[in-house]
Curated annotation (Swiss-Prot):
The gene is trpA. It comes from Tolumonas auensis (strain DSM 9187 / NBRC 110442 / TA 4). It comes from the Bacteria. Belongs to the TrpA family. This is Tryptophan synthase alpha chain. It holds the Pfam family Trp_syntA. The alpha subunit is responsible for the aldol cleavage of indoleglycerol phosphate to indole and glyceraldehyde 3-phosphate. Its EC number is 4.2.1.20.
Length: 268
């Protein structure tokens, strides 16, 4: 059984949804980044969604772009990211760990080589933000070869054919966008998404996690009430890092408290 399947079964039995924080690995530097991941787990994160820093993150707003810049300026490489992931995996053998990244990072290797290294580091899933569903075949083939779940985005304006394709190709979970555009806590998630959730379930998609603009417990609660399996929050988490760069201990405590608050909102 995959770690995602086990997680969703456990949460359903406990009448809870999932809360999944996102950060960019290496932000603000590799050593602190590892402490940040530990702080998120301490707060009760059900899974992790982690970015590998990239110089041109087109799907991201300024907050996560700045996180990638800080990570790159601290000389974070894909190899360093995999080292950090390996250590986190060794300490937390049951925690689902997903990567959210851009195709160029895969192409600096071959898809097969990248997914082989990801598997060795303990990665469960990969979402490639800038690859459309219809162009994802070589990536999915490499992911399947190494037993890594392929995550696909269900956009808010998707028609039934798109949702059927997403449902057919996805494994692990479905990333449901609350709104169009780039990432960012400044632009709130737009509810309702009930019709998309109903269609995804009808088409047999894996559980949906709602992302983009999730920054408050009320939004997590609304997502789960609408039928999502949980919520992903990125920019709101990264803002805590950004606003506390000169006070690392305060930053870690605020991150843990934020996750606790968001996780508490997942109780059904």
């Amino acid at each position: 059984m995959s770690r995602y399947t086990a997680l969703f079964e456990h949460l359903n039995a406990a009448n809870q949804g999932a809360f999944v924080p996102f950060i960019t690995i290496g932000d603000p530097n590799p050593a602190q980044s590892e402490q940040i991941i530990e702080a998120l787990i301490a707060g009760g994160a059900d899974a992790l969604e982690l970015g590998i820093p990239f110089s041109d993150p087109v799907a991201d707003g300024p907050t996560i772009q700045d996180a990638a810049t800080r990570a790159l300026n601290s000389h974070t490489t894909t190899a360093i990211c995999f080292d950090i992931l390996s250590r986190i995996r060794a300490k937390y053998p049951d925690l689902p760990i997903g990567l959210l990244l851009y195709a160029n990072l895969v192409y600096t290797h071959t898809p097969e080589d990248f997914f082989k290294k990801a598997k060795a580091a303990g990665v469960d899933s990969v979402l490639i933000a800038d690859v459309p569903v219809e162009m994802s075949v070589p990536f999915k083939a490499a992911a399947d070869q190494f037993g890594i779940e392929s995550i696909y985005i269900a956009p808010p304006n998707a028609d039934d054919e798109t949702l059927k394709t997403v449902a057919r190709l996805s494994s692990g979970y479905t990333y449901l966008l609350s709104r169009a555009g780039v990432t960012g806590a400044e632009t709130r998630a737009q509810m309702p998404v009930d019709h998309l959730l109903t269609a995804l379930k009808e088409f047999g998609a894996p559980p949906a996690l709602l992302g983009f603009g999730i920054s408050e417990p009320e939004q997590v609660k609304a997502a789960i009430t609408a039928g999502a399996a949980g919520a992903i929050s990125g920019s709101a988490v990264v803002k805590i890092i950004e606003h506390n760069l000169n006070e690392p201990a305060v930053m870690l405590d605020k991150l843990t408290q934020f996750v606790k608050k968001m996780k508490a909102a997942t109780l059904r």
